[in-house]
A protein has these predicted regions:
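Conserved mixed alpha/beta catalytic, RNA-binding, or beta-rich assembly cores of soluble enzyme
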Residues: 1-58
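C-terminal binding/interaction regions
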Residues: 59-98
Length: 98
């Protein structure tokens, strides 16, 4: 998958080799209350590399001050869904599947 962190229509961070969590931490520190978007790469084969979101993703958002997560419905693996939603709710993080 691919992650980008944005605030007020400005890109704070784009995921590189360091991975999703490092991108979130870097971007969130540059723009508090930022939005994290996690999507599949163009022409990505869902059989081999599915974008994933879990409690570690939400923990990184909490640590960096990001306030919303946007994921691609039907193309993102949400592990431990109940725990992810509860943790996000507890910390005021909105999750949108589009």
């Amino acid at each position: 998958g691919q992650t980008v962190v944005v605030k007020n229509m400005a890109v704070m961070a784009v995921e590189a080799i360091e991975g999703t969590d490092a991108c979130i931490l870097r971007g969130g520190k540059l723009g508090k209350d930022a939005v994290v978007a996690k999507t599949a790469k163009p022409a990505q084969d869902d059989r081999f590399d599915v974008p994933g979101v879990g409690t570690k993703t939400i923990q990184s958002m909490i640590e960096s001050g990001c306030k919303a997560l946007v994921i691609e419905a039907g193309h993102t693996l949400l592990t431990e869904r109940e725990k992810v939603v509860a943790l996000a709710d507890e910390h005021g993080i909105t999750i949108v599947a589009k």
